[in-house]
Amino acid sequence: EGGGMYTPGGRGGKVIVVTSLEDSGPGTFREACETGGARTIVFNVSGIIHLKSPISVRAPYVTIAGQTAPGDGICITGNSFLIDTHDVVIRHMRFRRGAQDVAFRDDAVGGNAVGNIIVDHCSASWGLDENMSIYRHVYNRDESGHGLKLPTVNITIQNSVFSEALDTYN
């Protein structure tokens, strides 16, 4: 439902299986998110993935199918998860930013999304700026030096909970 209801996500693309709870390397969530091309990310592991640096999804046409994880599912913690593209579907994921590095007051889930985004059956907590914020910045390098904020379009956030922010900016 909603504005993002027509996004194809990773439909028709390759299926990438996450086999490791490590932050980076073969079979990791980071590797799957940073791969190009249409893709559906599934899990054959469950547990906590502790990020040492933010994950940025930059290549469009991706579905993250958290419901495929066995047991208690997947929780992303320790750093931010950023949507910096279009046509993304995220289902059944937990994001817990946490206060490991308070010098960077970032969101649990955020990014510079263009549009056609679905976030469904997800939760985000312990963000240091907001728990979730999606907006679009386009940086204009004209003589003024100011960036532009453009609208993000066709976003659906449904059946999700965003709670327990850690800072006064939330």
Where are these regions (language model features)?
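Acidic Gly/Asp/Thr-rich repetitive segments characteristic of extracellular carbohydrate-active
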Residues: 1-41
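Short, solvent-exposed beta-strand edge segments and adjacent coil->beta transition regions
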Residues: 13-15, 104-106, 129
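Blade-edge beta-strand/turn elements of extracellular beta-propeller
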Residues: 20, 73-76, 165, 169-170
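Extracellular beta-strand-rich solenoid/capping regions of secreted or surface-exposed proteins
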Residues: 29-37, 48-65, 72-91, 97-115
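Active-site-proximal loop/turn and secondary-structure-junction residues that shape catalytic pockets
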Residues: 47, 136-138
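Right-handed parallel beta-helix
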Residues: 61, 66, 70, 86-97, ...
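Structural detector of coil-to-beta-strand junctions
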Residues: 80, 108, 131, 168-170
